[in-house]
Design a protein with these regions (language model features):
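Intrinsically disordered, low-complexity terminal regions
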Residues: 1-73, 144-242
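Short, charged helix-to-loop "capping" segments that act as catalytic/coupling loops
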Residues: 113-119, 157
Length: 242
């Protein structure tokens, strides 16, 4: 909120808002969208995209039952792509972009096929939606979502890991490997978890198996999992014995 308020304060506020504006925010970012946005909504989207460090943002906002494909004709590779508040839409992204945010969307299907330069996708507070991934993704973050499907077309496309928190009925398929995650079920055998704060990491372990581990914080604040910390300690002890 503070970041958004600061951005609003920096805007000139001249002229009436028009559809498809290119709005300079914080003298660093441009937001392009097909609908009229309030200054606060413009600022919130810009703040979400690293508070001014993303030079250009293309946003699909509050669309309903839209079927749309992004390619080289309507998406430039220096843009961050944002989907927010969409209902019943189908989007296909075939061209390059910097990063993708999906938030507050319901009953939508997203096909990500074009190269994502940062290999980062963030999904927040969505329901009954599908993410069909056909490109390399190193970090996929899914938070506070309900009844979501995430499908990587091939195992090789998940080049890193998935972080999730506060999700109910999250189905993840990576190639032929399948995993189902649910906060309510997790809470049933671990009463220390918190729906807002506790994060989990889905990744492949050293045996090549798709696993899900709770993220813990070391004394120095570094985030890891118990399995990763145990492996580090084992390797450290072996080094000391040499």
């Amino acid at each position: 909120k503070e970041a958004a308020d600061k951005i609003i304060a920096d805007q000139n506020g001249e002229g009436k808002e028009q559809p498809r504006p290119k709005i300079k925010i914080g003298k660093k970012s441009l937001v392009t969208t097909e609908v009229v946005l309030t200054k606060r909504e413009q600022a919130r989207i810009q703040a979400k995209c690293a508070a001014g460090h993303a030079a250009k943002i293309l946003a699909e906002v509050k669309q309903e039952k839209v079927v749309k494909t992004f390619d080289d004709t309507n998406l430039q590779d220096d843009h961050v792509l944002v989907f927010t508040g969409c209902v019943g839409c189908t989007y296909t992204v075939n061209s390059r972009c910097v990063k993708i945010f999906v938030e507050k969307c319901t009953q939508c299907t997203f096909h990500f096929n074009g190269k994502i330069i940062t290999a980062v996708v963030e999904v927040d507070r969505c329901e009954e939606s599908n993410l069909l991934i056909g490109t390399d993704v190193g970090t996929l973050q899914v938070e506070q979502c309900k009844r979501m499907n995430v499908v990587f077309a091939e195992k090789a496309l998940m080049t890193g890991y998935i972080i999730w928190a506060g999700c109910f009925t999250l189905r993840v398929q990576v190639g032929d490997d399948l995993m189902r995650c649910d906060f309510e079920l997790t809470k049933g055998f671990d009463n220390t978890v918190n729906v807002e704060r506790t994060q989990f990491k889905i990744h492949y372990n050293t045996l090549g198996k798709l696993v899900c581990d709770k993220i813990i914080r070391l004394k120095n604040g570094f985030p890891t999992t118990k399995m990763e910390d145990d492996e580090f300690q084992r390797m450290h002890e072996q080094t000391l014995k040499v």
